[in-house]
């Protein structure tokens, strides 16, 4: 599978490296959950850098987990960062046997067992990020084609993400493909995470 992936360009923008370094970490919404436990659970979002050889470029493995159950993530993924000039394009991949790799964001021995053969591309679900001053603003690629079925209802993902060096703000909503009304996702506003630990030094140096 690795050979079928596009090669990384000869030149990579500093913005791609900056975004990758800012993403690489353990993010927690502890403060938000502490202040409003009725509406927000305490969640961690982990992004752990993959070795350069995985994509011949910059890649990340991610987990989203409840703080009380760190070994049972409710969302896992692999992400490939691609330089598109004035924007950073992030391809998203799912894991074929996701629970086999639970905890890989915290245990590098597990992370090493993830290979390109373990993942499948989530077409139409890529994210596009642009830098705006001291932050990156991102969202799912246009077209309303990142489809997710929930409770028998076909929905498309509407996603907003804002990243700084120390914070991660995100709001994911599932919208009915016919009525465009919200079916799932937060109705109380975005999740607000603060970086508790950085893994930026694990990002390959390709500049």
UniProtKB/Swiss-Prot annotation:
Name of a matching Pfam family: CpeT
Function: May attach a phycoerythrobiline (PEB) chromophore to apo-biliprotein(s).
The family this protein is said to belong to: Belongs to the CpcT/CpeT biliprotein lyase family.
Induction (free text): Induced under green light, it is part of the cpeESTR operon.
Stated name of the protein: Probable phycoerythrobilin lyase CpeT
Keyword Lyase found: yes
Gene: cpeT
Domain of life: Bacteria
GO MF term (any one): lyase activity
Presence of the UniProt keyword Disulfide bond in the record: no
Alphabetically ordered keywords of this record: Lyase
EC number annotated for this UniProt entry: 4.-.-.-
